Amino acid sequence: DFDGWAEGLKLGRSYCGDGLSHVLDFKVNDVAVGEPGSAGKISTLALTQPGKVNVRFDVAALLQEKQTDETRRIRNARLDQKPYWHIERCRIGETRRVPVEVIVNGEVAWRKEIEADGSVSTLNVPLEIKESSWVAVRILPSVHTNPVWVTVGDQPVRASKRSAEWCIKAVEQCWSQKGKGIRSAERATAKQAYDEAKSIYERILSETTRN
């Protein structure tokens, strides 16, 4: 059912990965990623005040039991060399274990090592949510989920000044590289769109207190 698959992708019911690790059935409390949550909002759990939530997911990863010359090459390659994402880069020392992390607002909030033998583990992680946050699961750099948004007191997520500043610079850089290639008849409209994007990130920056 291609239409159903495309709709799920649009709603965020997916994750990014190299195919050698997987995170399935990711939920925060009873809200699943890519599914309607509080007040019907996709991937959103609304809390009236700070409190504890439960993060639940199934996770599996597969590493060769013993390293080879090729897997060592992958593991030791620079991050700007292919393959950029590969489970071998996650191997802990000479073991067959990899780290699973729960991320809150871009920071590691919880970490556990699992055996990367292909078996599926069901994990439940209690977390204290102090402010509106996005929550995701990863084995980096092998798999990363889309986020579940947890709002507190109906406040927006304002995770990081550095992130907002990076986005502003990214918009500016993109325009400096792409703007000259846009047809003159369309350039003013395009510039307006870029300026609007930049203004959104500037507003987010002004509302953010955390670095």
Predicted regions and their residues:
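C-terminal functional module detector
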Residues: 1-211
